[in-house]
């Protein structure tokens, strides 16, 4: 059928299905990314990569809430956040706080002992792939959000953009360590991830008690 002959309702439903598919892909990708990053982070003794992997699993919880949000908005465009989404935000927020504490303490211990990872090449590869994939997801979610005129989906795109920033932190820290061998780069990268984790955690907790659209809606 010619797309120009589709009714506005049919086009809208297709766009919502695409938005839901994008949210599911984000969840699945984060699971695989988390497993890979945590495994090699542990094996290569790189805190930044391991912390990045833990963050990916926390993003899965957030992603479940976002997927649920897309379905809710599809059925009731003007509805407010429901208990499931608020619970997902709270779990996400407190998990980020725990991660922040762990990253800061680990980074301090690493800097004190001048710990040297065996290698950070996997961190370079994982972060590069993540930047490409997450950037593509940001563009796709923004396009769908604009077509649907949905602030919720546009907010989700902003959440995904934060993942690009965190991948950039991992890339810089991992790349500089491989180039220089300076032991503090891994610790500094870990602290950079801790900053974003704390920011996301704080916003998730605050937004769980409000009707703001997303737990990480940075401009």
Where do the PLM segments sit?
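Alpha-helical transmembrane cores and adjacent cytosolic helix/loop segments
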Residues: 1-219
């Amino acid at each position: 059928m010619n797309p120009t002959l589709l009714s506005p309702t049919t086009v809208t439903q297709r766009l919502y299905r695409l938005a839901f598919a994008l949210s599911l892909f984000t969840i699945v990708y984060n699971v695989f990314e988390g497993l890979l990053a945590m495994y090699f982070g542990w094996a290569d003794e790189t805190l930044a990569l391991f912390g990045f992997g833990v963050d990916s699993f926390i993003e899965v919880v957030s992603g479940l809430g976002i997927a649920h949000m897309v379905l809710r908005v599809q059925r009731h465009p003007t509805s407010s956040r429901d208990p499931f989404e608020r619970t997902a935000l709270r779990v996400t927020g407190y998990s980020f706080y725990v991660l922040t504490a762990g990253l800061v303490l680990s980074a301090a211990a690493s800097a004190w002992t001048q710990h040297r990872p065996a290698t950070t090449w996997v961190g370079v590869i994982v972060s590069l792939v993540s930047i490409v994939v997450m950037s593509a997801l940001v563009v796709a979610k923004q396009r769908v959000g604009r077509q649907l005129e949905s602030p919720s989906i546009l907010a989700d795109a902003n959440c995904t953009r934060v993942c690009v920033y965190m991948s950039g932190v991992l890339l810089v820290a991992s790349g500089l360590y491989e180039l220089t061998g300076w032991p503090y780069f891994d610790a500094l990268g870990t602290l950079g991830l801790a900053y974003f984790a704390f920011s996301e955690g704080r916003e998730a907790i605050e937004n769980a008690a409000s009707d703001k659209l997303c737990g990480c809606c940075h401009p």
